[in-house]
Every structure is written in structure tokens, then in C-alpha cells.
Amino acid sequence: LIFAFLIALFIRTFFFQPFYIPSSSMEESLLVGDRLFVTKFTYGYSKHSLPFSPNISDKRILFSSPERGDVIVFKTPEDNDTDYIKRLIGLPGDKIQMLNGVLNINNKPIKREFIKNDFVLCGGTKIKSNFYQETLPNGKTYLAAYSEKNSSKDTDVYLIPQNKFFFMGDNRDCSQDSRYLSSVGYVDKINLVGKAQILFFSNNEEIGNLFTFWKWHKSIRFNRILKFIK
């Protein structure tokens, strides 16, 4: 039993770690009730690769730079303990700004195409939103939701420091992310936990949970099981 525990701990620390999505900040890419695997080796290792993040070193070994557009789990700079999952938007040295409701990277608006008008979950309430397919400078595409009411208000320019990264949720007006400098802000490379890779299970908890087995045929999102994260 102890040997099995040590094997599981080794895999969790160095290879794959499961995570659960509790909020709607990344809808529609990630939904509340999604369960996914994060690869721990993609960006190398730091103290946050270990259980309970022991304060043993402020260095990162075998570091490999993340790519713009990656969906990443990281520890929030506010407490270096809480796990957040967001999309990487800004790299060290970048200038990031929301201007006229459009994401600008290094003084250029990104390409985007209107896809649909639909409802998106925000704090338990469904908000009417416009969905756009956004294309980052490296060609990475994803679907982002903008509330009809808020529409991501204009911001100052964020200048990303060295060894720091800027993250945003795909559900733009329902995401606590790097735009909020006092609570999230710029994320140090030490705080990166891993890259979100694949969904292994998904359950719509508005319909039922894992104990209400008679609702599984409706609550389990079978079309999301073993789906790669883009």
C-alpha cells in the first residue's frame, strides 16, 4: 500500500496532476465540472511542483518557456497557494491592453471574428455575451466571451516584467486574472504548475452529481471525455 502511494505521488509530482474546474472563468474552453490532467514536465519544475509547495528553492529547473495561448495552471502571486487556470496572453516584455473592447498585444489589436451571441455562466447567473474567435500573434485560436453589458472595459497598458507572465480567462468579463494587479497580476515563472492537456471527465452539476447515478445519462458530458484542451 505504501509503495502504491509513493508511485502515485511520484507520478503526480513529475508527470500528471488532476484538476477540477470550479468556476466559469474559462468558458467555453473549460466548463464548471470539467476534470483534466495537467502535465508537470512541460515547463520544468519548481517548489510548486511538489505537494504543499515547500519553501525549498526559488529556482526553476529544466525550464522550458510556455507559448502564448497555452492554458496553464499556476499558483496565484497573492498567496502562492491557490491554483488558478487561465490562458497565457502576455510574455515577458510584452505590452498588453484592452482598448475599445479589443485585446491589444504590443500596440496591435488581435484578429477576431464574431461567432455567436449566447449565454455564458458567471457566478451562477447566465449572462448574454458575444463570442469571438480570437487569433493571437503566434496563430493560436480560441473562443472568447464578452458580456454585452461590460464588454471588457478599457485598461491601462500592462508592461510585463522579465520572468513574468500575463494571464486572462476566456470568459473575459467573469474572470479574476492578471488585469487585477492586487490579487493576481503578473505571474512569476516559479508559480507555473503545468500545462492543461486533456479532459478525462466532465459533469454538469446543475443536473446532478456523481452520487445521483440515475441522472448520469443527462449530467455526464460524454462529448467532453478525453477531449484535448486548445
Residue ranges of each PLM-predicted region?
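Secondary-structure boundary/capping signal
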Residues: 18-19, 34
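N-terminal signal-anchor transmembrane helix
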Residues: 19-29
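Soluble "head" domains of membrane/secretory-pathway proteins
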Residues: 28, 32-230
